[in-house]
Amino acid sequence: MEQGRPRSSLSLTSSASTVSSLSSLSAKKPTRVVHKVHAFGKRNNALRRDPNLPVHIRGWLHKQDSSGLRLWKRRWFVLSGHCLFYYKDSREESVLGSVLLPSYSVRPDGPGAPRGRRFTFTAEHPGMRTYVLAADTLEDLRGWLRALGKASRAEGEDCGLPRSPARPRPGEGPGGPGGPPEVNRREEGRTSESPEVAPLSRGPGRHEMHAPGSSADLQPDTWSRRTRSPEPFSPLSRPPSPLSLPRPRSAPVRRPPLSAGDISFPARPHTPLSRIDVRPPLDWGPQRQTLSRPPIPRRGPFSEAGGGRPPRSPQLRTPEHRTQSTQVSSGSSTYLQLPPRPPGTQASMILLPGPPVDSTLHQSLETDTLLTKLCGQDRLLRQLQEDLDKRQEEKEQLEAALELTRQQLGQATREAAASGKAWGRQRLLQDRLVNVRAALCHLTQERERVWDTYSGLEQDLGTLRETLEYLLHLGSPQDRASAQQQLWMVEDTLAGLGGPQKQPPHTEPKSPSPAPQREESSERESLSESLELSSPQSPEVDWGQPPGGDRALSSSQSGVGSPRVSRASSPECRQQSSPLLRTKAPLARPRMSAQEQLERMRRNQACGLSLPRPTSPRLLTLGRTLSPVPRQPDMEQRPIVGAAKWLRSSGSWSSPRHSTTYSPVSGGHRERVLSLSQALATEASQWHRLMTASPERNLDTRGDCLQPSPQPPSEELPQVTSSPTSHKANSATTGFSCQGSGRGLAPWEPRWDPGKAPPALAQEEGAWPLRVTLLQSSF
């Protein structure tokens, strides 16, 4: 049992050659004790650097020589993983030496240290060589101390639980391709140990003779398995949880569950208590044992925790081993780990949540940051606008000076000297004009960029104000108070800014002009015009409103109106309406109702006919009363030619009481329109026959006389007058006389002689094509 066990093993916490170990073949040779500090890790004994490990810091440092006059030598140092390598120069070709930093104490030198250089620090280990290094600046010193301190405490993401690795490949060290060199050379039998280890490593202790003896009967192959595998390098302290450790690159993904013999951790009583033996992992550093972190809390027996590891045999863990695994050396400054806490205290300490995040403070800081950025962008916009104004004024002055110079050149062609001066002045002005225009272009692009940032900040501020208003109404009392303060701060800042900035004119989204609408099809124009004039709103209310936003607002509130008089047509609302709404506005037009189609048919029929002037003064008065007031200029109304500008509705003007939105009907809508148009044509032909017939047929006992419709005055045609032929018909011998008040049906008597026929209408006058009886019923 004792022959299969090596006398000494490789201790990674100090270095690969601090305590050299013999292979199983050289175990019979006596170990020679060297009573001096061994200079380790230089040249051939240096560790091989793994190129896959990350480099934490690299740079130039001055290293004090360990022999002779203690001269300072400038070397290139690289901290990779937990090992410090140094080279001759920054090409990093050949390693001059290596220092494995775990269990080293790295501290800066005091001001009174007789080093001869500034910014020095020391890395020392008991029984090992002490390294004295010096940085060039104070910042370099702080950076190196921070990095080397973490590496000496074995902190970082590349340290973890050493797992049972696969067998090392031939030609590789026990730690894999990047591990320490294999130390089974026979010519290295004269390797030495440190003074502390040598007196204790001459033979096994008493506890070592008896402690594993009880388990030797139960597990006879334990020591042979330990000899073949690198298990003697496993740590003596409690290992952390395997779930928190990264998987090595060369290790298999899945491993079989370990037996009790594989998990046993042998004790080494000949090792000082201040050192822990760790086996070299596969990647020589990524999974190194974390020495400064507290161990995983115990949750009771393994059967309760449900872990994947089987319970250890009680014979494998003696009280001596427990004391060795929990004791901490007072001489080493690296191992400042406290003894394990009780399970309840440790679990409660780990499960304690962090301090709650103050959402109110975070939101206040966000508001303050947003307002600060907004003020900065506002200042930039104002400065850019001032610069643009100055450059624009300078450009105008240069253009005026160039015009004057051009005139002088035209006048002074005879004088050579004056002409030369004028040409030089013109050249200078042209150069300055080019520079000013280039500056204008640059300032314009800069203003566009700042404006984009300003617009984004305005949107963020609007969202933040909505959130604050929501908290002000529905939040907790504390949130309400904070939201109110932030809202006041926002209002004060915006008031100090003097309102929002105006968008640059050349980047303003242009609203659709009415010119393309005029060039559309005649059907679309007729629809818009009929919607304008046959709107459900009464003309008195519509024409009595002031121009601008109030009219547009009332039109949008009514729900129905023409797209030309919508809210988006006013200049104020054109800037506020989004491009999406402006593109969809022309598409959302309602279908024409039956009444609107009749209006359109009548208007088209009356366009080419000049209507005669009614002879009754009563009808003239009513026509003037019903004539529409000229519309406001902001309505973008298309000019109407001829008699088509005056449209008579069927019966009366629409009233707000009957303002119902038209919903398109299905089924016989088209047939209904055709039947109505046919009835109108029949009535028109009957009216034509009545006007051209004899007086006997014209005088009917029904008294159901038809009243001609008035022709109101308009802008282009102040009063539609009849032709000379109709003027003769309106004389004293011919015409109409009305009796009654105009309410209801009243007999209309002719004023011509009974023996004579009524005057026939001229061809250019035409007949009355409209249903004028409905106009009488509306009075």
Curated annotation (Swiss-Prot):
Residues 183-193, 517-527 have a biased composition (Basic and acidic residues). It holds the Pfam family PH. GO terms for cellular component: cytoplasm; extrinsic component of cytoplasmic side of plasma membrane. The keyword Kinase does not apply. One of its GO terms (molecular function) is phosphatidylinositol-3-phosphate binding. Binds specifically to phosphatidylinositol 3-phosphate (PtdIns3P), but not to other phosphoinositides. This is Pleckstrin homology domain-containing family A member 4.
